[in-house]
């Protein structure tokens, strides 16, 4: 009885929680517009491993740098060693070979520690004591000239960290963020992600590549579908293929590389790039043959464009709707005229307030430029002092104090400058000057007269229609009360 109960419990547990066993996961690094997947890792196998190329990381980050206005001081060179900084954790301790212990708690921002970065890229969080990272178990890496073998514990996947150089300067060379992802259910391709040059080549911007793919997909559907591109992940694949170029006889040694979730036939079109893969419609898979009749697309969805050109049937509108519409129109016109005149009376006041805001904004921008110029002088002196104390490890290490950096942001002032004038944001009238230099009682009398005139014109327009409908109402009611003719009882049936 005990064994049967144990077996029954195990069967129920595996049935209710199938995702905790045998569901492969991994950790994905994001830099710029590119992503790098680790080896399969999870709770059972918590060590996530990457083999990264430093030159590829540099190209990927140059497309989307973390700090657009970053002042670059140090440049990557092969003999330089690397430091790794997980963000917002305990202060690092050097452990030889150019490595830092994976813990940091400095109140200074290290994500973009130099001048030129904006406030949203360098958030100030203050000293943070948790979570605590251990260098050997949570994060470690080995550097071999231009390549890095990175090892990260799966529990720390979801954080961000930077790679710095053992060289003068403070700018991060690479800023990476991580996120836990699931391995797609389709079999992994035999070729690496970097070999799909028509999708992941870092030298070509993502936007131009996506536009070409959207144009090609629209041509294949004769512009009858809307294309929605999903660039969040490449876990599912779509294929665009030419059915006229399908291989006639299958190769017995060919293997299926991947099975796309969507295959779109496109014949008699000229793609913006050559076909790069071989798709077999009977197998519904990309094979290792060299027929070159298809191209792999990022995930997107096709939906038919709604037809809005259908004719509408006209129906007679009852008299009650005419009356309600007339009353509503009269009330709306009166309210609109009154509201426009009321807003126009405060136009001069808004203009004066807008001028005061403009003067204050100019003064703040001028003070910001002066502070930024002083900060640049201080940064220049800091570089020179670091070169003088280079043998002691830099200025901060020589004086045994924390290295702080000045982060000056002008985001709020720029947003204030880009906003339209206060008069355009508040007044939504007809653009006419209703002030006319009149007193308050004269403006109120003018408003009342315009309202009465609008109601009188509305009565002239709608009144004849209402009277005509009321005159014909008795005859319509009489015809409706006698739908059948009376029988003449004097006639012989």
Curated annotation (Swiss-Prot):
The 17 amino acids long immunosuppressive region is present in many retroviral envelope proteins. Synthetic peptides derived from this relatively conserved sequence inhibit immune function in vitro and in vivo. Residues 344-390, 400-432 form a coiled coil. It comes from the Viruses. The record marks 315-316 as: Cleavage. Keywords: Cleavage on pair of basic residues, Coiled coil, Disulfide bond, Fusion of virus membrane with host cell membrane, Fusion of virus membrane with host membrane, Glycoprotein, Host cell membrane, Host membrane, Host-virus interaction, Lipoprotein, Membrane, Palmitate, Signal, Transmembrane, Transmembrane helix, Viral attachment to host cell, Viral envelope protein, Viral penetration into host cytoplasm, Virion, Virus entry into host cell. The mature envelope protein (Env) consists of a trimer of SU-TM heterodimers attached by a labile interchain disulfide bond. Residues 379-395 are annotated as: Immunosuppression. A motif (CXXC) lies at residues 225-228. Residues 1-22 form the signal peptide. The surface protein (SU) attaches the virus to the host cell by binding to its receptor. This interaction triggers the refolding of the transmembrane protein (TM) and is thought to activate its fusogenic potential by unmasking its fusion peptide. Fusion occurs at the host cell plasma membrane. The transmembrane protein (TM) acts as a class I viral fusion protein. Under the current model, the protein has at least 3 conformational states: pre-fusion native state, pre-hairpin intermediate state, and post-fusion hairpin state. During viral and target cell membrane fusion, the coiled coil regions (heptad repeats) assume a trimer-of-hairpins structure, positioning the fusion peptide in close proximity to the C-terminal region of the ectodomain. The formation of this structure appears to drive apposition and subsequent fusion of viral and target cell membranes. It comes from Human T-cell leukemia virus 3 (strain Pyl43) (HTLV-3). The chain crosses the membrane at residues 447-467. Specific enzymatic cleavages in vivo yield mature proteins. Envelope glycoproteins are synthesized as an inactive precursor that is N-glycosylated and processed likely by host cell furin or by a furin-like protease in the Golgi to yield the mature SU and TM proteins. The cleavage site between SU and TM requires the minimal sequence [KR]-X-[KR]-R. A lipid is attached at residue 465 (S-palmitoyl cysteine). This is Envelope glycoprotein gp63. PANTHER family: ERVV2 PROTEIN, VIRAL ENVELOPE PROTEIN. Pfam families: TLV_coat (PF00429). The gene is env.
